[in-house]
C-alpha cells in the first residue's frame, strides 16, 4: 500500500508508475483505492462511477477499470457533505457525521472489493487517501491504516519535497501512528526533488538513522506528464506560444471533471487559462463553462462575481461559448430541483442562451458513449455523468449524434454556442480538431491525447525504474502470511 504524508504527495502517480512496471514484467496487477474523495470521476464499461486516478492506474496495468478498483467514492457537494457512491452507484448524500456512522457499511464494501481483486490478480497495489496522520479521523478509518490493519498490508510512505519540510512530514507522520502502524511502514519514497542529490544525502542518512527505515529512492520533479489529476485544479497557464486559441474556463467552487480540459492544455494551438474567484474573465476566443456538482449554487456564484455579464460581453464581440454537463444546464432558461437534490427544493433562472429547461432527478445517468459531432461528423468518444433531464426546442439542433441512436446537447441558431452533457469532448483527435476549427483556429491540427497519456505512463515507469530501488520496494510490499 502507498500512503502519503499529505494530499497531492504523489500517491496516485506512484501507484500508476508501479502498475506499469509490474505490467511490463508480465505480472497480473490491479490498482485499488478503498475510499476516494474527488469530483473528477470516470465511468466504467458497466456504467459505474469511480475516481479518475483509478481509471488511469487501470490503464497503466493494461486493464479496463472496474468499480472494485475504487469501491467508495465521495463527491463533495457542500463544505460538510458529499454524495456517497458505493460500488459505482450513488447511495445518497451524507454529511460528515452521518458518513462517519456509515463507515462500517462502507468498510464491508471495501473489503469485498479487495477480496475479489486479490482472488483475480497476482498483485494489488493499494493507494491511501490524504494522510494517515489525521488523528481526528482515526476511528473507523477505511482509507489508510484502518484498511492496512484490516488486511495486514505493508505500507510505503511517500512525501513531496517540493513543498518543503519533507523530513518533518515523514518523521511527524510516523509519530502520529500507533506502534503497530509504524511497524507496518517498510520505508519511504521522496517525490518531486529538484537540485543536487548529493546535498540531500546527509538528510536521507539522518532519516534512516532516526526511523530505522530505508529510503527506496528520490524521484525527480517531472514536467510535462499528461496524466489525469486526482482533484486539484491546475490553474497555471498552458505553455502554448505563437498564434493560439485563447480559452478561458471559470473555476467554479464545485467544478467537476476538469480533466475535460487536459487535452486542450496539451495542444500546441491552444492557450488555456483557468480563472479563479475575484479575477475578471480575460479576453478570449472561447469560454467554457465546466461541469459542476452543485449547478444552482455555482450559477449563483458565477453571477455574484459578474461573470454572467462578462460572458454576455464575450458573445457580443463574437466569441464562442461551450457548456459541458452542469455548464450546459446553466445555459438554458431554467434549472429546477423539486426534490432538493442539491440543497433546498426550488428553481433558478439559467443564463437563457438556449431554449431548454433542466429538472434534476434522482436517477443518475452513467454511461460511456461514442458518436459524432452533428456538424461535420467528426468522431468522438466520451462519457455521461449527470442527474438532470433537459427538455426544450433547442435540442432539435443537437451538438452530438450518438451511435446508440440518441442525440445530445444543442447548438445555437447562430452557431456561436454549443452545449453537451458529454465529458471527454476534446480527447478524440478529429473531434478536437473540428471544435478548434469551429472556435476559430485556422488550419487546426488533430492531437491524439490518448497517445500522449500512454507515452506519459511509459516515461513515468522509466523514471521510477531509474530512481527507485525497485527490488527492495517490491519485496517490502510482498503480501504477508
Curated annotation (Swiss-Prot):
Report the Pfam families cross-referenced here: CbiA (PF01656), GATase_3 (PF07685)
Give, as in the UniProt entry, the pathway in which the protein acts.
Cofactor biosynthesis; adenosylcobalamin biosynthesis
Give the Gene Ontology MF terms in alphabetical order.
ABC-type vitamin B12 transporter activity; catalytic activity
Q: By its UniProt entry, which PROSITE patterns does this protein fall under?
A: GATASE_COBBQ
Which Gene Ontology BP terms does the record give? cobalamin biosynthetic process
Entry keywords, A to Z:
Cobalamin biosynthesis, Glutamine amidotransferase
Per the record's keyword annotation, is Ion transport included, yes or no? no
Tell me the ranges covered by the GATase cobBQ-type domain, including all copies: 244-431
Active site location: 325, 423
Q: Which HAMAP family match?
A: CobQ
| Family label | Belongs to the CobB/CobQ family. CobQ subfamily.
Q: What does this protein do?
A: Catalyzes amidations at positions B, D, E, and G on adenosylcobyrinic A,C-diamide. NH(2) groups are provided by glutamine, and one molecule of ATP is hydrogenolyzed for each amidation.
Q: Which NCBIfam families match?
A: cobQ (TIGR00313), PRK00784.1 (NF001989)
Query: Could you identify this protein by its name?
Result: Cobyric acid synthase
Q: Which organism is it from?
A: Ralstonia nicotianae (strain ATCC BAA-1114 / GMI1000) (Ralstonia solanacearum)
The organism's taxonomy opens as: Bacteria, Pseudomonadati, Pseudomonadota, Betaproteobacteria, Burkholderiales
The gene it comes from is cobQ
Amino acid at each position: 500500500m502507498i500512503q502519503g504524508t499529505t494530499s497531492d504527495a504523489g500517491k496516485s502517480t506512484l501507484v500508476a508508475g508501479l502498475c506499469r512496471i509490474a505490467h511490463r514484467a508480465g505480472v497480473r496487477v490491479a490498482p485499488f483505492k478503498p475510499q476516494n474523495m474527488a469530483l473528477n470521476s470516470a465511468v466504467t464499461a458497466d456504467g459505474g462511477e469511480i475516481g479518475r486516478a483509478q481509471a488511469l492506474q487501470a490503464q497503466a496495468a493494461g486493464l479496463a477499470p472496474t468499480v472494485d478498483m475504487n469501491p467508495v467514492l465521495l463527491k463533495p457537494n457542500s463544505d460538510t457533505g458529499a454524495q456517497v457512491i458505493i460500488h459505482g452507484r450513488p447511495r445518497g448524500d451524507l454529511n460528515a457525521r452521518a458518513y462517519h456512522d456509515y463507515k462500517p457499511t462502507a468498510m464491508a464494501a471495501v473489503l469485498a472489493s479487495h477480496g475479489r481483486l486479490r482472488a483475480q490478480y497476482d498483485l494489488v497495489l493499494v493507494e491511501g487517501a490524504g494522510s494517515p496522520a489525521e488523528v481526528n479521523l482515526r476511528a473507523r478509518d477505511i482509507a489508510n491504516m484502518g484498511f492496512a490493519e484490516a488486511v495486514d498490508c505493508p505500507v510505503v510512505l511517500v512525501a513531496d519535497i517540493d513543498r518543503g519540510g519533507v523530513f518533518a512530514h515523514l518523521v511527524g507522520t510516523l509519530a502520529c501512528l500507533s506502534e503497530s502502524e509504524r511497524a507496518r511502514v517498510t520505508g519511504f519514497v521522496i517525490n518531486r526533488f529538484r537540485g543536487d542529490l548529493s546535498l540531500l544525502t546527509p538528510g536521507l542518512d539522518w532519516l534512516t538513522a532516526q526511523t530505522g527505515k530505508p529510503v527506496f529512492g528520490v524521484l525527480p520533479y517531472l514536467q510535462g506528464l499528461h496524466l489525469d489529476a486526482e482533484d486539484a485544479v491546475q490553474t497555471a497557464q498552458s505553455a502554448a506560444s505563437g498564434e493560439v486559441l485563447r480559452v478561458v474556463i471559470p473555476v467554479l467552487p464545485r467544478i467537476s471533471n476538469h480533466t475535460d480540459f487536459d487535452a486542450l492544455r496539451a495542444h500546441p494551438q491552444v492557450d488555456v487559462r483557468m480563472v479563479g474567484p475575484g479575477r475578471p474573465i480575460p479576453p478570449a476566443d472561447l469560454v467554457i463553462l465546466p461541469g459542476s456538482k452543485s449547478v444552482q449554487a455555482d450559477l449563483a456564484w458565477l453571477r455574484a462575481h459578474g461573470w454572467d455579464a462578462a460572458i454576455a460581453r464575450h458573445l457580443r464581440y463574437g466569441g464562442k461559448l461551450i457548456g459541458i454537463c452542469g455548464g450546459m444546464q446553466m445555459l438554458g432558461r431554467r434549472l429546477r430541483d423539486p426534490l432538493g437534490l442539491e440543497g433546498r427544493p426550488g428553481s433558478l433562472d439559467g443564463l437563457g442562451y438556449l431554449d431548454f429547461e433542466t429538472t434534476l432527478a434522482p436517477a443518475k445517468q452513467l454511461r460511456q458513449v461514442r458518436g459524432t459531432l452533428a456538424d461535420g461528423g467528426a468522431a468522438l468518444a466520451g462519457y455521461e455523468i449527470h442527474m438532470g433531464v433537459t427538455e426544450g426546442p433547442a435540442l432539435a439542433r443537437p451538438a452530438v449524434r450518438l451511435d446508440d441512436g440518441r442525440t445530445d446537447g444543442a447548438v445555437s441558431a447562430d452557431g456561436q454556442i454549443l452545449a453537451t452533457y458529454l465529458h471527454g469532448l476534446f480527447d478524440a483527435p478529429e473531434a478536437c480538431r473540428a471544435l478548434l476549427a469551429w472556435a476559430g483556429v485556422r488550419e487546426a491540427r488533430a492531437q491524439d491525447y490518448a497517445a500522449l497519456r500512454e507515452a506519459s505512463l511509459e516515461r513515468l515507469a522509466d523514471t521510477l525504474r531509474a530512481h527507485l530501488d525497485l527490488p527492495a520496494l517490491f519485496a517490502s510490499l510482498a503480501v504477508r502470511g
